[in-house]
A protein has these predicted regions:
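Hydrophobic alpha-helical
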Residues: 1-17, 82, 101-164
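Structured segments of extracytoplasmic/periplasmic soluble domains
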Residues: 11-18, 25, 53-61, 85-89, ...
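Flexible loop/hinge segments that line or gate small-molecule binding clefts
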Residues: 10-45, 63, 159-167
């Protein structure tokens, strides 16, 4: 799980004091470990891509639902964008629910089910983590009266997510996505650049996401991550945190 500053910062600072180069990913420790190099998905971009699609699909001034868990760095960053879109587009947030556990999808589904039963007028739900998106799909499945009436907007991508999105009549219509393999390679490249002195202490690197829609998956017959990589080569982000002396890696 994502670490917290009070547990991470002492060790990170101790390592840096000893001359060890430290690159962190997707944790918020800049305030207490300012010399570490920060890397992360561009969560603001990930959220805005999806919420722009939601706006296009449902319009302004609509009742919507929200499934998220605060206190986790990337979800907090996506939450900030959500709040901005709520205000700008006059959406009425009818509920916010969600729970982060070892079984997030299973444990959150009943909470979303209860929220839907009390707010059956929502036309869209934003669930910016794929386990929360899965919980939302499960809850909608137990409310057949809402079939075809609620669109779901998520985050992340995997072969399992692709199967859910491309299923017939799936309410999951869009997600913001990066390739975990490509992200891992980019973090390693960032470390190499930091060790070489090109990336300085305290630097920050954001890795850009793309928008994936269910329409795209179906029209291009994308069944898994390999298919998606072939159809969306920009997922590879091979030019991010790169140099001519670092071998290019593709997936």
């Amino acid at each position: 799980r994502h670490g917290f500053p009070d547990t991470l910062c002492p060790g990170v600072n101790k390592a840096i004091d000893k001359g060890i180069k430290v690159v962190i990913y997707d944790v918020e420790i800049q305030k207490c470990a300012q010399r570490a190099v920060q890397t992360q998905q561009s969560d603001a971009k990930m959220a805005s891509l999806v919420l722009d699609q939601m706006l296009k699909d449902v319009g302004t001034g609509k009742p919507v639902g929200y499934v998220n868990v605060l206190g986790i760095a990337p979800l907090d960053r996506r939450d900030a964008v959500w709040k901005d879109y709520i205000a700008k587009n006059q959406w009425t947030q009818k509920f916010m629910t969600g729970k982060y556990t070892p079984s997030t999808a299973t444990d959150t589904a009943p909470m979303v089910d209860n929220a839907l039963k009390s707010n059956a007028d929502v036309v869209a739900i934003y669930a910016p983590y794929d386990e929360l998106t899965k919980a939302t799909l499960s809850a909608l499945g137990t409310n057949p009266n809402l079939k075809g009436k609620v669109k779901v907007y998520g985050a992340d991508i995997s072969t399992a997510d692709i199967e859910l999105m491309s299923a017939p009549d799936s309410p999951w219509v869009a997600t913001g996505a990066t390739d975990p393999n490509a992200i891992g390679a980019a973090v390693v490249r960032t470390l190499a650049l930091h060790m070489a002195g090109t990336v300085k202490e305290g630097a920050k690197e954001d890795f850009p996401p793309i928008l994936v829609t269910s329409e795209m998956l179906r029209s291009k017959n994308i069944k898994n991550m390999d298919d998606l990589r072939k159809n969306a080569p920009e997922l590879n982000i091979s030019k991010v945190s790169s140099a001519d002396w670092i071998p290019a890696v593709t997936f």
